[in-house]
């Protein structure tokens, strides 16, 4: 069974959050169209996401394992287990949906903490002395980032404002995921638009995006 991993990043409950509202609508429609997908969800602002610490890293900067792991305290072992569980779950997925609000031209810090957990040498990326390369090109995968924002940013300046979208595009491409889509829920705080209209406009784009996000049964040889 294929897996759809849905990551929402907002302290607000779903009914108050534009990004979560659009994210829910997307994943519900996606699973209706493709029932062979198992939906896995994380509301990471309301779950425990570890912050990386030197105690959990070996001399190469990798998550500890083997004897280094055995030397950890019981509590630190649980933290490392959680980090590895999040990473392994990410590797096992096929389609990723990340819904978040724009904060200071980026995204809430909890999302960066999550990304730090899933970017691991030997699992999602291969790091050598000369280069680093992604390991997630082993099968077709796709990512959709749903970003809500109070304002509306014309394309001519969007690249200067949407640093969060740009960062996520770059980091996932570096991991080997080449199919990347975005859904901007803009104008939530603009008087002539507002949350309701911004969400409705985003809803109108969902069906087309679902077709783009579906992945084939292709495994890299």
Curated annotation (Swiss-Prot):
UniProt keywords, alphabetically: Flavoprotein, FMN, NAD, Oxidoreductase
Pfam families (alphabetical): Flavodoxin_2 (PF02525)
Catalytic activity: 2 a quinone + NADH + H(+) = 2 a 1,4-benzosemiquinone + NAD(+); N,N-dimethyl-1,4-phenylenediamine + anthranilate + 2 NAD(+) = 2-(4-dimethylaminophenyl)diazenylbenzoate + 2 NADH + 2 H(+)
Cofactor(s) demanded: FMN
Keyword Glycosyltransferase (UniProt): no
HAMAP family referenced in this protein's UniProt entry, alphabetically: Azoreductase_type1 (MF_01216)
Similarity annotation: Belongs to the azoreductase type 1 family.
Functional note: Quinone reductase that provides resistance to thiol-specific stress caused by electrophilic quinones. Also exhibits azoreductase activity. Catalyzes the reductive cleavage of the azo bond in aromatic azo compounds to the corresponding amines.
Protein's recorded name: FMN-dependent NADH:quinone oxidoreductase 1
The species this protein was found in: Clostridium acetobutylicum (strain ATCC 824 / DSM 792 / JCM 1419 / IAM 19013 / LMG 5710 / NBRC 13948 / NRRL B-527 / VKM B-1787 / 2291 / W)
Taxonomic lineage from the root: Bacteria, Bacillati, Bacillota, Clostridia, Eubacteriales
